[in-house]
Amino acid sequence: MLTPDNKLMSETETAWERYKEVVESITLTAEQEQILRALFAVSPFIGRVAESYPEHLVTDFFDGSGSSVRLIDADSYGDRIAESLSQVTNEDEAKKCLRRLRHCWMAKLAAADILQQVSLKESLHHYSTFADAAINKSLEWLFERFVQRHGKPLDANDQLMPMLVIGMGKLGGKELNFSSDIDLIFAFPEQGETQGPGRNLEHGVFYKRLAQSLIGLLDETTADGQVFRVDMRLRPFGQSGPLVTSLNALEHYYQEQGRDWERYAMVKARMIGADEQYEQAFQQLIRPFVYRRYIDFGAIEALRKMKLLITQETRRQGVKNNIKLGAGGIREVEFIVQAHQLIRGGQEKSLQTRSVYIAMNGLVELDLIDPEHARQLLKDYEYLRVIEHRLQQIDDQQTQQLPTDETGRMRLCAMLNEPEWETLQRKIDECMERIHAEFQQVVGAESEDDEDEQGLQVLWQDMLDDDAALEIIESEGVDEPQALWTLIKNFRQESRRRSSGPRGRSALARLMPIMLRHAIQHQHPERLLERLLSIIKAVMSRTAYIELLAENPGAREQLCKLCMASPWISEQLALHPILLDELIDPQQLYSLPESKDYAAVLREYLMRIPEQDLETQMDALRQAKQALQLKIAAADISGVLELMNVSDHLSALAEAIISEVVGLAWQHLTQKHGKPAGTCLDNTGFAVLGYGKLGGQELGYGSDLDLVFVTDANYQGQTDGQRPIEVQQFYLRLAQRILHLFTTRTVAGILYDVDLRLRPSGQAGLLVTQVNSFARYLRDDAWTWELQALVRARPVYGVPALRDTVMDIRRSVLSQKRDEQELRQSIVKMREKMREHLTQRNSRKFDLKQDPGGIADIEFITQYLVLRYAHKYPELCKYSDNVRLLTEAQQLHLLTEVDAQNLINAFQIFRCESHSLALQGEQLLEEHNLDNERQAVLNCWNHLLEDD
């Protein structure tokens, strides 16, 4: 007998009086009145429904004059709903009708349940059958109208195709709670177009609109409430996936994209109201995904992760005393059963069931669980399910939370016939302790380390709405959680659309929460995560790299460090993922060769590649350059290398690559045409001059190469091969082949951009110049700016004799006496022209190279001093780099010590900033404190070049 506390009864007095006014014409026995008042006291929901629908509820609430609640047969729900819907003409009326039926039937079911007139299994059957009927009859009502409006969706045999509704979770298992949401997936049999008199629709569009209308009928909150909360997050790709999916697409998804937690979800999946052919097709589709042919102990690890997600989420929300999600709750019983189902279900057909009860019996028969333990588990499970129903029947709320307020506790005690709260709490605690102990036997105990390892797993799984996700991110101290969440969502959506196989998906699932933790702990989480994701996106289909990062903390640490320090590095890693191999050994990453050893390192990269395999050699050179450049950048960022050494290493690397490229070009050309007389691989009769930054040993990250090709070969005669060509043509083809090797874009990118415009006569000149012609041009025809460029030129490839010849030509040309006034005017005019075209006008940013007081001014000053005084001081021709030339000028008293140091200091600072900008992927300096350095440069400029 339901006997609520007197305090509860008095609190419902007003509601009872209001109810009697509405139903004054209805005669109740004293016992019936007492029962109704008690129900109102423990369930405000029943009271509200009785007051709102008196003519539909109370007139036949009791079975005659007795105390039993009159329930309709569960199998008649469908007919009753169909009959009611046949009397409405639009969706608004349909919504009102469905909500009235739902509230009245649920109120009576709640009453019968509370009064213990139905068993738990009977009530579960009622709730689930009503849900099936509401879905099926609503869909039938809508489908008929959609066909009239848009035509018939027909299959290849001209048969009308229904929309297929897949029930998940407790609905799928026919174990629905009193106030539960329903988890659905929508599908349709075949692609095509509707057939009808009006405008045809693609089947996907037709079923999508139909699904939206069905959700509206059931889920929309109107003045009359809801029928069911509809949750679509279990569909393929979750919230980002299509609302309705074809069966073929569904099959492809679970074969290629299905995740571990979806296997658990699919254990209970069933089609609701579908013909047998579709149900069979669905089960054949899903069975290989859910039940593996082998014993699958990996299911345990997947379950532990899912349980950890639930634990993290309940802790985040501050949830306590939750009889479903807490330790020892309903979900753990389900997990115990489902873990065994997924491990052995592929071999044991008796475990392929949606029912907890049937599956538990199967486990006992297979000796997988002790019979007494199974009996106690089911008893405890049923006890918690009864409490779950009572909690929800209080106010028709989907809750599994034990009440903390006095009224809620009194209501629950009354509904469960418990005299006091402490007794009930103790029974619940004992029940959940037994369940949790059994759960730990199956999946192992949890630890804080497990949670640390999983990191932010809950953010990566598609189980959170936006508000919950943002709350988690914000709780981690992130200033702009929305930006971070958008990055995560977009990347997650893209990753699920790209096939990487089960192994790849598993590795990505392990990696992503860890990387999220790295990003969130950083000062600029959004910036770091964006760079990390660009790299992970690039290797998503390369499982080995995902596993490398997931399993190698050192590699992850270096990746985060380098990506945060430099977007240029992250871009290089994204473009060339093979560089991730360099992160495995941090000690090796920061260990650089000596400048003189780069040639030997390159040879190691190429030594195992057959000479005739030019394509592989080209890729290997590119990969070597990228790997070595990454090591230089890593050493730069960590402070291992100083500025001058960075450029030294980058320049030495470029020289070694030039030597290898010329060698490769020579070998492939001579194999075809033979070689000129008196030449060989070690003495090609060919030299490469480096100009600009390479010539000045001031190369930066991403710098191109300014090159000039010269030869001392005799152009008379032909090569000595089977297909001989003229010697001049040979060297032209050699230059073309060198350019090809440098600039062709392979899968590994390009080697270097090469600029040959500084050769004699520029773009109009020959690609290769004979040394005599080279000397004559520089001596007789070169413009002042070409002589300035020559100051920074030096041989970077060639035998010593040819290098010496070229340097002698350079020295001879630079040492010519020049008209001081004419030289000064020419240099000033050229610089003014550059400023006019290259300076960023009206910009607060500083162009380190071109703006007044920048690098170009220092270079022009240096070049002026060489061209002005080298005829008198040949020492000025020894070097091609600015710092040593300025130092030499000071020692020759061509500059004061102050001016020389100011120029050198400014140049080194600007170069350092230039390296930093390159690593940041920028070209202009935004905020700087370099006004003093710029002014010192301008003072020198004015003193040397402007003052008369």
From Swiss-Prot:
* Domain of life, source organism: Bacteria
CDD domains linked: NT_GlnE_GlnD_like
Per the similarity annotation, which family is this? Answer: Belongs to the GlnE family.
Protein task: Involved in the regulation of glutamine synthetase GlnA, a key enzyme in the process to assimilate ammonia. When cellular nitrogen levels are high, the C-terminal adenylyl transferase (AT) inactivates GlnA by covalent transfer of an adenylyl group from ATP to specific tyrosine residue of GlnA, thus reducing its activity. Conversely, when nitrogen levels are low, the N-terminal adenylyl removase (AR) activates GlnA by removing the adenylyl group by phosphorolysis, increasing its activity.
Q: Where is this region: Adenylyl transferase?
A: 453-948
Identify the Gene3D superfamilies for this entry. Answer: 1.20.120.1510, Beta Polymerase, domain 2, Nucleotidyltransferases domain 2
An example GO CC term for this entry is: cytosol
Q: What is its EC number?
A: 2.7.7.89, 2.7.7.42
**What InterPro entries does UniProt report for this protein, alphabetically?**
GlnE, GlnE_rpt_dom, NT_sf, PII_UdlTrfase/GS_AdlTrfase
What keywords tag this UniProt record? ATP-binding, Magnesium, Multifunctional enzyme, Nucleotide-binding, Nucleotidyltransferase, Transferase
The protein depicted here goes by the name Bifunctional glutamine synthetase adenylyltransferase/adenylyl-removing enzyme
**MF annotations from Gene Ontology:** [glutamate-ammonia-ligase] adenylyltransferase activity; [glutamine synthetase]-adenylyl-L-tyrosine phosphorylase activity; ATP binding; magnesium ion binding
- Which cofactor(s) are needed, names only? Mg(2+)
Give coiled-coil spans as residue ranges: none
Using the UniProt annotation, give all residue ranges assigned to the region (Adenylyl removase). Answer: 1-447
Gene Ontology process terms (BP): regulation of glutamine family amino acid metabolic process
> Reaction(s) catalyzed by this protein?
[glutamine synthetase]-O(4)-(5'-adenylyl)-L-tyrosine + phosphate = [glutamine synthetase]-L-tyrosine + ADP; [glutamine synthetase]-L-tyrosine + ATP = [glutamine synthetase]-O(4)-(5'-adenylyl)-L-tyrosine + diphosphate
Q: Which Pfam families match?
A: GlnD_UR_UTase, GlnE
